[in-house]
Design a protein with these regions (language model features):
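Short polybasic amphipathic segments
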Residues: 119-127, 169
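Acidic/charged, solvent-exposed loop-and-adjacent secondary-structure segments enriched in E/D, K/R, S/T
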Residues: 126-141
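A contiguous pocket-lining binding segment that forms or flanks enzyme active sites
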Residues: 151-158
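Sec-dependent N-terminal signal peptides
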Residues: 4-14
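Sec/Tat signal peptide C-region and signal peptidase I cleavage site
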Residues: 15-19
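Acidic, serine/threonine-rich low-complexity disordered tracts
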Residues: 20-116, 158-258
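Intrinsically disordered, low-complexity regions enriched in acidic/Ser/Thr/Pro/Gln residues
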Residues: 144-147
């Protein structure tokens, strides 16, 4: 039972770090996730990101994230979580966001559409075999979803901030809008996956829930170059801690990690 909860918490943590499309991927990022088991880090899952041109909205992109447990854990507890966001390619404002969570016998879907003319977000929440409900949330300005906010953060001009500056962000999470922030922690030279390079480091304020402790319990290392790759994420969760490290990245410009 302890392993089940550890795995569920781990992949939930990584996702807060590929369907067929007629468009080729603009960018693909593949992460291996690790759970801190006492004094060692245990490989437990993967998270794959794929960014393509949206087929549903003009001047928009479609970002898909898939998190799944490794076969060595599947016989204990299987996780297959999928998140999809369609957002404006310049402002990162979302048009549509969905999450399909399949964790053991737990199956739940979240589907949101953002209606800017009416200033509302409409949600369809479905717990398979249990309930289905619709939510209407008042849409506030500059509200991101769980995926679009990650791509927006990659474009922040961190060079204009001082260490410990707070950058406000607003996110829709489970039918509620939260005013949070990113704390900028400065530039460090880090060795990640055997490679040293300069990184911007920042810590987002987290909402406490089934996975995360509330507060500044996550750190993100972003490459200080033209690609702004999220190289590593570390977070404390309710039981232990998790880490996701970028294994592979590619785009129409080539493989950044070679």
């Amino acid at each position: 039972m302890k392993k089940i909860w550890i795995l569920r918490l781990f992949l939930g943590g990584c996702l807060s770090l590929c369907a067929q499309s007629k468009y080729p991927p603009i960018e693909e990022l593949v992460y291996t996730g690790y759970y801190n088991w006492g004094f060692i880090w245990v490989k437990a899952g993967r998270v794959d990101f794929s960014l393509t041109t949206s087929e549903k909205y003009p001047n928009a992109e479609r970002l898909k994230a898939v998190g799944y447990s490794l076969p060595s854990w599947d016989w204990i507890f299987t996780i297959r979580d999928t998140l999809i966001s369609h957002f404006d390619k310049n402002t990162f404002m979302p048009y549509e966001f969905s999450r399909k969570a399949h964790e053991g016998n737990y199956h739940k879907t979240f589907d949101y559409t953002f209606h800017y003319d009416d200033s509302v977000v409409l949600g369809d929440i479905h717990r398979i075999g249990k309930f289905r409900r619709t939510d209407t949330v008042k849409l506030l300005g500059q509200t991101y979803d769980m995926l679009s906010v990650a791509w927006m953060a990659r474009e922040l001009d961190f060079d204009k901030y001082q260490k410990n500056d707070l950058i406000p962000i607003r996110i829709l999470i489970d039918s509620k809008i939260y005013d949070l922030y990113i704390r900028y922690l400065g530039v460090v030279k880090s060795k990640i996956a055997g490679r040293k390079q300069e990184c911007y480091v920042f810590s987002p304020l987290l909402v406490e829930g089934e996975v995360f402790k509330g507060g500044e319990n996550m750190k993100i290392w972003l490459s200080k170059d033209e690609y702004r790759l999220p190289l590593m994420v570390e977070a404390k969760i309710l039981v232990g801690s998790v880490k996701a490290i970028l294994d592979r990245s590619a785009s129409k410009y080539g493989d950044f990690t070679e």
